[in-house]
Amino acid sequence: MKNLKLCFAMLFLLIANSPGFAEQRRKVIIDQDCSGPGGNNMQTLLTLIQSPVVEVLGITVVSGNQWRDEEVAHTLRLLELVGRTDIPVVPGAVFPPVHRRKEAMLWQAKYGKVAFAGAWDDRWWHEHDTIPELLEGPPRTQAADEDGFLIRMVHKYLHEVTIYEGGPMTDLALANAIDPHFAELAEALVFMGGGSSEPQTDDPEFLSAPRHEFNFWFDPEAAKSVLEAPWKKIVCTPVDISVKTRITDGMVRDIKESDSAAAQYVVKFFMKDQGGFYMWDELAAAAWIDPSLITKKDARYMSVDVDHGAADGNTLTWTDKDNPRLGARLVEIQQDLDLARFNKMFVDLMKAPTPRAH
């Protein structure tokens, strides 16, 4: 059995690193609030990096779950551990242009405390330029000094680059503001965010506020402007479908059977004390790689509430019939998935050898 596994691993490496195969890889830039170590943000980076059909052009890092500089450090260290330091890590926005922690705290005092406030959360609050000691050890590599990276890449690879967004949309809003052609030159925008209906869950966080979602809430003005930009295609993985997923102890035990660097990272930093996590961003990434994972979807016009009232940051959606024609664009909204296939795909990717740079 060990010899058979070795043969499969060698075959995987030969295919993934062959010149012809590399030319067929789909290009993506990951924009992510890369909190870590472990957890769904790091596992999303691995989902895309581990796929032999994906070429990760770079990772832009935006404040969200944690502050940007802390997230950059986690990302650099992850790439060191899996041997992919060739992928540039580009620091993005530290703060949303409009929202600040003070405003977020005042909003919660008036309208109710949110379940998760990311970098602003009292439970782990620190100043934006403080980097706590990393459990995985400090990175030895440095972030890339790449001003305008997002814009430069979509101009270099016209209509070939998918923008994967797993955090607040601050970086994308800034890119659109600097270059009005940014969105139209990309292949597509794929993002995790928003909530479009009442999710099928007993989780009180989402039952009481089904249209509230952290990525939109952290920077609603950015999300609204990005969703109004002229993308060729927009695909949304909302809360509704995300809460149907969860990384389980059984999945981690299966991953533990592999000695790949990705597998060892996932196992070491699995946050078991919280009973596993919804696989929000991993699902968005996996469904971009293999759209057949999604078994039900809809199309709605989508925007974000920016009135600074009780619904600030909430998701707004319309059908073609009731669309107010105020700039919202049509978005493909995922509604259901083949959960068994998704779980298997994630486990298999984590157990596989990491594709080399090309």
Model-derived features with residue positions:
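Hydrophobic h-region of N-terminal signal peptides that target proteins for export
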Residues: 11-20
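Short, surface-exposed amphipathic charged segments that create phosphate/polyanion-binding patches used
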Residues: 103-112, 203-207, 251-252
